[in-house]
């Protein structure tokens, strides 16, 4: 026999779980507490097991309650998708796109999105910034229509469109003693320096650890863990250490002479910027238009590194005359 659950009951379950109180759930829904209690009692009678237990005076979902919560989230997401799809059918030229962007991409993604909005002002964009783990979670949960990041994990079934290359380098204070060294610098040499690194879960951190491991210097000593590229740059300029970092995040500082690029063996490591969407995510015309735009024109918004000292190692060959940069397959962002 099919259950007699209602959308209102499932919504009340979600509100009660979030607030830990039927009274607060009633307030949020504009109902009286007795009405909510009656709804929850009817739902528990229908499923035959308790949905909540009281712990320290708060409601906590049981295993059955967690199952209902998961179902409610899926249903709410499906209804939201249906609402957006219907709106797109009524006005195909309009729409909205939720865009997840890894934090390192904020040095070009806003400019690209602004250009897209100028061309398609009728499309609403919502921008969400996070580290690699945050963005992957948003793709898996189907919260994002499009994500701007590096290559997604192989287990994640996704469509990807290439935006452009993404080089990684090591930067240092302009007066660092290593710039006077005649011998070529290796990653192993850097283990004797103070390294400023991103937090675990950051694609830059993952890639840095891979570079050191492949160079035979795993687990490099970390002087400071910093969750912001901006703070890392300021810390390097202040003389606190060296940083393995995206070249796109330091283009302005290198051009202005506030940071210098160390010539390190095996660097730069080049990965790719991609526009990504989950294959399970229904992409409406507005999202498809953004994917097409990023593939076609996204590379033009990538920061350009200066030539000359340091810059020659990661400018394109036709600009710098340098040897090709090292490319790493399946690089994280």
UniProtKB/Swiss-Prot annotation:
SUPFAM superfamilies: Periplasmic binding protein-like II, Winged helix' DNA-binding domain. Signal peptide: none annotated. Gene3D superfamilies: 3.40.190.290, Winged helix-like DNA-binding domain superfamily/Winged helix DNA-binding domain. Pfam families: HTH_1, LysR_substrate. Keywords: Activator, DNA-binding, Transcription, Transcription regulation. InterPro entries: LysR_subst-bd, Tscrpt_reg_HTH_LysR, WH-like_DNA-bd_sf, WH_DNA-bd_sf. One of its GO terms (molecular function) is transcription cis-regulatory region binding. It comes from the Bacteria. Residues 5-62 form the HTH lysR-type domain. Residues 22-41 bind DNA. Belongs to the LysR transcriptional regulatory family. PANTHER family: HTH-TYPE TRANSCRIPTIONAL ACTIVATOR CMPR, HTH-TYPE TRANSCRIPTIONAL REGULATOR. Transcriptional activator for the cbb operon (cbbLSXFP) for RuBisCO and other Calvin cycle genes. Binds specifically to two binding sites in the cbbR-cbbL intergenic region. This is HTH-type transcriptional regulator CbbR.
